Amino acid sequence: MAVKKRSIFEEVGQGAKAPVPQGGSIDRGHGGARRGIRLWLMALFLLVMAMIVVGGLTRLTDSGLSITEWRPVTGAVPPLNEAQWAAEFDKYRESPQYRLMNAGMTLAEFQRIYWWEWGHRQLGRVIGLVWAVGFLGFLAARRIPRGWWPRLLALGALGGLQGGIGWWMVASGLEGDKVTVESTRLATHLGLAFIILGLIAWQALLLGRSESDLLQARRQKEGRLVTLTTVLIGVAFLQIVLGALVAGIDAGRGFPTWPDMNGTFLPADMFYVPGVETDWRNPAWWLGLLQNPGFVQFLHRMAGYTLAALGLIFWIFGRRSRHRATRGAFDLLAMALLAQILLGVGTVLSAAEWQVAIAHQVGAVVIWVLILHARHLALYPRVGSIRKGTL
């Protein structure tokens, strides 16, 4: 039988084609899931941002203590008739806030503050529902990229924790002769809200680019800018917590002057705590200082100046980046910081008028997200060699 002669080079250029390089494990078969999960996270981001704004308005309208029970499920249904409204009003009239601050309030006036608090809680329920439907839906369809389900589950767990902290905060204003919630609990509640918002934003940024893009981009990360933005995250978070402490005791309304504080740099009685001797070694004195309007307002101003100064200094470093998108991110951050300074001064001079105060709170959200965006681009620069698919 004749045997066909074959060239020793026949397999080269003939037969099976060379395999085309593939993306990472997350990219393979999960492109649609990445887009879907990112859209779901963006919806959650908008809802959490709305939650922060509505929460701020609820506080500014003194509505947060109008609902004196925690009913996560049955509380979703508001009073539907006169008898139910009367029952809710009776519960509120047993609270110290009603007795000491709102005695004589009419049912119509109560309904106005009730709707603010009910809306705030209802928005929390909506967030929980959107998270659960999205997470369980992607999980059941097996469309969650490898390694991502713990991150997405953690968001839901933090959301549940936030609901519990919210009630823990409200409960602090229903005891004794309290007419407001404990400022430290308010700061805990708001701080966790920003942590959740930041985690959602970060995951959405990552999902906006393919895994192969991120792997290539990370090789060109700008370590100094990553470090600087990490510092900014820490200072910004401290400033957010201090802002909550100021809001919790209405400290902003006691010093409506700028750049001084009622004519002085250090406010009078800044270190005074009623009933506690001034002693640097006494923890009770330190905790008491958090209830001193002059002390917390001074710290909030100083932290604001620090954040603005660091942000503008870091902007100079950001402008030296060899990546255009990174430079643009630092430009946006610098402009937002300047705007936030103006809003902060406006909040002080207006004695925390609600319109200016809520704009200042929204400004904090914007700066928080822009710092994360700048850090993302410092860690994963957009470069011309990376194929399309970037955010």
From Swiss-Prot:
Its EC number is 1.17.99.9. It comes from the Bacteria. It is found in: Cell membrane. One of its GO terms (cellular component) is plasma membrane. Pathway: Porphyrin-containing compound metabolism; heme A biosynthesis; heme A from heme O: step 1/1. One of its GO terms (biological process) is heme A biosynthetic process. The keyword 4Fe-4S does not apply. It is a multi-pass membrane protein. Heme binds at residues 300, 360. Its cofactor is heme b. Catalyzes the conversion of heme O to heme A by two successive hydroxylations of the methyl group at C8. The first hydroxylation forms heme I, the second hydroxylation results in an unstable dihydroxymethyl group, which spontaneously dehydrates, resulting in the formyl group of heme A. This is Heme A synthase.
